[in-house]
Amino acid sequence: VEETPVGSITNGVHGATWVSAEVDGVLSSTVGDDWQWADHDAWQAITHVDGDALWQAHAASKVRMVDHVRDRLRHHGLAQGRSASELEWVDTALDPSALTICFARRMATYKRAALLLSQPERLRALLGDDDRPIQFIFAGKAHPADDHGKELIRQIVTFSHDPAVRHRFVFVEDYDMALA
């Protein structure tokens, strides 16, 4: 251990790929334009980050994400033969100011994607609470040979089609890096 020190394990995450353009701007102005490669000492500048600027970057990223998800929902609805009037709800789906929980990954049973659905009435109550708005965005694919993973997706999609919750509980098809 002393001979091979390990500073961190990232599981292959490449920060510059996944950080939004807005947050990238804050990091560049705080840590430096090369924040992706900055050393520990350079990262100490993050303790002086402008909290308002960081929050504004987060909020702008979230608005962009909501717009992108709405576009995806509309596109897939039209591709499935739904009319524009049937998809009017998409214009108000998701609220950029609500607590947003995203689950976007490979759908496998051990990841417990459908755990929320084990108490559907409780989930409906949470989704309907306008005083404490919360919303969920699901996306992902199952391995072609994983029937259980496909069943998880079916359960999530079925719940997301409920008109009472579809504005706060969505499944986005064709998960890819653009959506991620």
In which residue ranges do the predicted regions lie?
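Catalytic cores of carbohydrate-active enzymes across secretory and cytosolic contexts
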Residues: V1-A180
